[in-house]
C-alpha cells in the first residue's frame, strides 16, 4: 500500500514526478510512494533540470488544529479517573518527544508504547508502564479494558496492539491524536479525534490540562507488573533445564 503512485511515460517527466514523490513520501505521515518508469522513458533523453517540490495544491499533509477538539480533549483528560495513554511512532517521527514528556508529566497519566514508539519516553520513567500488544506487558494489555479514557497519540490501533476489536477498550472514551485522517475511526472509533501533528497538538493542549496525579490507578499497573514478574519473568530466569535462557543472559549483561 502506497501514499501515492505514478507512471512516467516520458523522460522529461522524471524530475518533476520525483520531486513530488519525495515531498509526498516525507511530509505528513511518512510513507512509501511508487514510481513506475516505462521502458521508453528509461531510454529517452532530455535536458535535465530539477526543482524541489515545496507544496501540492490538492494535498495537505498536516491538518489544521481544531481548537474545539483540543478543548474537548482537555476537558475529558481533566475529568478522567483512570486515564491511559498509548503512544506510537508518530511521536518519534514528529519530533515530539519533549512535548509528549511534558504532557505525560503534567497530566500524571500512565503511558505505554507500541513497539515503534519505544524511544519517545525513557523506559525508566515512573509513568512509563511498558509496552502494549501481543508482545507487550501484562498490565498495559489488561488495563486497556479497565481505563475510562484511552488517549492514543501517534498510533494506528494495529491488530498486533488491539487483538480482538470486539472486546477492545469498549468501556473507555477514546481520544485519538492523529496526523492522517485515514487512520481515524479505521479500527477503533474515536470519540474525540484531534487532527494535526502531535508536536503542535500537544503543545497547545498542555496549557489546558491540569497538574494531576493518579496514584491509585498507577498502583494497578504496579500490581500487574508483580504478577508478570512472578509468573513469567522469574520463571524464565529460573528454568528447570540445564543451560542459560535468554532471560538469564539479559540479566547477566544488565548487571
Placement of each model-derived feature along the sequence:
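Conformationally flexible catalytic loops at phosphate/diphosphate-handling active centers
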Residues: 20, 24-79, 233
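Anionic-ligand anchoring segments at beta-strand to alpha-helix junctions in alpha/beta enzyme folds, i.e.
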Residues: 65, 72-150, 252-255
